[in-house]
Regions:
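P-loop NTPase switch/communication element
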Residues: 56-71, 174
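Conserved Switch II/interswitch segment of TRAFAC-class P-loop GTPases
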Residues: 99-103, 119-137
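Walker A (P-loop) phosphate-binding motif
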Residues: 3-39
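Conserved C-terminal guanine-recognition region of P-loop GTPase G domains, centered on the G4
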Residues: 112-116, 130-163
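Conserved beta-strand segments of the P-loop GTPase G domain that flank and frequently precede/overlap
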Residues: 51-52, 95-97, 122-128, 156-160
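Short beta-strand-centered segment that lines the nucleotide-binding/catalytic pocket of NTP-utilizing
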Residues: 41-59
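Switch II (G3) loop of P-loop NTPases
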Residues: 91-108
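C-terminal lobe/tail of nucleotide-utilizing enzymes
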Residues: 2-4, 153-155, 160-278
């Protein structure tokens, strides 16, 4: 079997989702860990293999208490191991979180060498900064040199969206969509007729979850009854502990709201895009 042929569909190889951008600071790890990891865990029913490739920042280390991923760090000096990690892990879904700038180019070059095995999906995150749209399109062009079916297998994540309302985020991400009444060039419609994308709403609960070492999705499904713990602490006169439990209860409630109003909507979009193989 010729493993270098990207058209070959390998039986037993699960989905590999590569989250990549040529620009740093666009929230790749937020999309990978807060959105894609819980989605795959929920659908597949097993821990997700999470490969982070970044010589400068290992954001996944913040998630010290997560129980939905098996984390693996890979430096750019070990990129020749990437294909083996993906190919040999036939029992899990795989997320590859690719660092920005030079790291992104090196990883894409490596994947181009070994082929995509026919099961790779690509997510390109971007913020609403002036250059983010152009950088996302530049990343898409690089992926198109590897991906045989880019129209189906590339999706954009509109990160730190202020609202999930389509009209609102279309204007917030004018750097990506453009606007009929405003001068704009090199926007996505110049290159793709029907691009796939989903907004990821910004919320302070995302920041809080990182400090707690977990994902928002896991926080929402934490079965701890913090209200009961607060009452018990108050009854024994431990007022500070009661306040602490009330604080965690608020975060838990905010996490549940985020799952219901943001993540579940994204999961529906991903359902139409990703075929989950059991």
């Amino acid at each position: 079997m010729d493993l270098l042929n990207p058209k070959i569909k390998l039986e037993g190889v699960k989905n590999t989702i590569v989250v990549a951008s040529g620009k740093g600071g666009v929230g790749k790890s937020t999309v990978a860990m807060q959105v894609i990891a819980p989605y795959l865990y929920k659908k597949h029913g097993k821990k997700v293999t999470y490969i982070e490739i970044d010589d400068e920042n290992n954001d996944s280390r913040s998630f010290t208490r997560t129980e939905i991923v098996n984390k693996k760090m890979l430096g750019t000096n070990r990129l020749n191991e990437l294909d083996e990690l993906i190919l040999m892990d036939d029992n899990h879904e795989v997320i590859v979180d690719v660092g920005g700038n030079k790291t992104s180019s090196l990883v894409l070059d490596e994947i181009k060498k070994v082929g995509s095995f026919g099961n790779v999906k690509w997510i390109i995150p971007l913020g609403d900064g002036e250059l983010d749209g152009k950088n996302a399109i530049a990343t898409m062009k690089k992926i198109k040199k590897i991906e045989k079916n880019p129209e189906e297998n590339i999706i954009f994540a509109l990160n730190r969206a202020i609202s999930m309302d389509e009209d609102y985020y279309n204007e917030q991400f004018i750097n990506f969509f453009g606007h009929k009444y405003l001068d704009s060039n090199s926007v996505i419609c110049d290159f793709v007729k029907d691009p796939k994308y989903f907004p990821v709403k910004n919320d302070k609960v995302i920041t809080m979850s990182r400090y707690l070492g977990s994902t928002v999705w896991e926080m929402a499904y934490n079965n701890t009854d913090f209200a009961a713990k607060a009452i018990q602490a108050k009854e024994v006169g431990d007022i500070e502990s009661a306040r602490k439990y009330l604080f965690f209860r608020r975060i838990q409630t905010e996490a549940k709201d985020y799952v219901l109003n943001t993540l579940n909507k994204i999961f529906c979009d991903l359902d139409r895009w990703i075929e989950i193989k059991k």
